[in-house]
Amino acid sequence: MSKKYDAGVKEYRDTYWTPDYVPLDTDLLACFKCTGQEGVPKEEVAAAVAAESSTGTWSTVWSELLTDLDFYKGRCYRIEDVPGDKESFYAFIAYPLDLFEEGSITNVLTSLVGNVFGFKALRHLRLEDIRFPMAFIKSCYGPPNGIQVERDRMNKYGRPLLGCTIKPKLGLSGKNYGRVVYECLRGGLDFTKDDENINSQPFQRWQNRFEFVAEAIKLSEQETGERKGHYLNVTANTPEEMYERAEFAKELGMPIIMHDFITGGFTANTGLSKWCRKNGMLLHIHRAMHAVIDRHPKHGIHFRVLAKCLRLSGGDQLHTGTVVGKLEGDRQTTLGYIDQLRESFVPEDRSRGNFFDQDWGSMPGVFAVASGGIHVWHMPALVTIFGDDSVLQFGGGTHGHPWGSAAGAAANRVALEACVKARNAGRHLEKESRDILTEAAKHSPELAIALETWKEIKFEFDTVDKLDVQN
């Protein structure tokens, strides 16, 4: 051997702490928020993360001499203090691209977060952000269609799209489920939706639901003259079953299907995305289980990382929270990962939680979906925050209308069109929200009743996971 092999244990920072390293354009960069055990130096903690998420092990091994370890290792090249947090720090790590299989989000996450989170030297660890190099992005399939293709397919332009989740989300028979879909779509919504946990239960088998939903869509299209859709959830316990459900939706002439991408897994999601592009189907993505992973401010994976990974894995729509509704998410953070879903280039901006410049090249964008505890009074804020390339989904805010789901849908449609008209006329939606909505309600009894019904409903809880610059 040309090099001497010295058996034993040495500190991680001797190999993986490289403050003089300048990251390459082809490197995959990651920012971790680290909280080490008491007495362990920051450099050792950060280097341990770099080692355990790349080539390292706890002991020197002879087989290191069989490869160029210095080429393949992850390198911690910078450490920063976390604003307002004396215990934690940011570790910036560069990984050579050859560590990862081309186009495999599964492989990237297995490396970066697969084992290191159980490391004893750490009290907490959170993956805050990833900068994917263009060479990796070009190897990924991405959204099966993208924003423009979806608008063309649905023939809907110049405004956010409207949707709602069918309620109650569990317990309805297939026929009654289809009836609720029909009421919502004829009332003015663009989409209705299966909830994340409706698959194929004893009270409603999936074939039965798909058939009645297809009938509801066709009837509502005939009545309204508009293209309609329903997110048919094809998530299943096996890939074979998932594709069987997707094929049946295609046979029924449905424009869009749905997948729970975290519980279903990135491998299944990427495969389904490829199938959708090949078969001309839109793909709606639900983020069920995300808060288990992303809500703790010191441990887990930030949702901006999951959003980036989803854009690479594939999906045309992704739930992002609402800012104003019942679910977690402050305004600036939400805007940050909405940018990651839709824009072709997102600059580093710590005020929005983006730690790196991210160039998406020509990869299509993803519709941001606002869903969870929203109603007509929220419409001006939602249009302001999310813009046109979004889907605004009102579940209880549709079905809870005193006159029923069709009236709730009509109220939402009138409120949306009033806000878009006011915005296009140069009015300030959030400052003039009450005037805009009450003016529209003079010509819509459905909206007037909705405004009265939900005038006192607010979700004013403090956000648990705040941007560190706010702390």
From Swiss-Prot:
Modification type N6-carboxylysine: residues: K193
PROSITE patterns tied to this protein: RUBISCO_LARGE
SUPFAM superfamilies per UniProt: RuBisCo, C-terminal domain (SSF51649), RuBisCO, large subunit, small (N-terminal) domain (SSF54966)
Membrane-spanning parts: none
Cofactor binding note of this UniProt entry: Binds 1 Mg(2+) ion per subunit.
Keyword Zinc-finger: no
Gene Ontology terms for molecular function: magnesium ion binding; monooxygenase activity; ribulose-bisphosphate carboxylase activity
Superkingdom assignment: Bacteria
Requisite cofactors: Mg(2+)
Classification via InterPro entries: RuBisCO (IPR033966), RuBisCo_large_chain_AS (IPR020878), RuBisCO_lsu_C (IPR000685), RuBisCO_lsu_C_sf (IPR036376), RuBisCO_lsu_fd_N (IPR017443), RuBisCO_lsu_N_sf (IPR036422), RuBisCO_lsuI (IPR020888)
Cellular localisation: Carboxysome
Predominant localisation class: other
EC number: 4.1.1.39
GO cellular component, one term: carboxysome
Alphabetical keyword list: Bacterial microcompartment, Calvin cycle, Carbon dioxide fixation, Carboxysome, Lyase, Magnesium, Metal-binding, Monooxygenase, Oxidoreductase, Photorespiration, Photosynthesis
Reactions that this protein is recorded to catalyse: 2 (2R)-3-phosphoglycerate + 2 H(+) = D-ribulose 1,5-bisphosphate + CO2 + H2O; D-ribulose 1,5-bisphosphate + O2 = 2-phosphoglycolate + (2R)-3-phosphoglycerate + 2 H(+)
Sites where the protein binds Mg(2+): K193, D195, E196
Positions marked as site (Transition state stabilizer): K326
Record's function text: RuBisCO catalyzes two reactions: the carboxylation of D-ribulose 1,5-bisphosphate, the primary event in carbon dioxide fixation, as well as the oxidative fragmentation of the pentose substrate in the photorespiration process. Both reactions occur simultaneously and in competition at the same active site.
UniProt cross-references to NCBIfam families, sorted A to Z: PRK04208.1
Record's protein name: Ribulose bisphosphate carboxylase large chain
Provenance organism: Synechococcus sp. (strain CC9605)
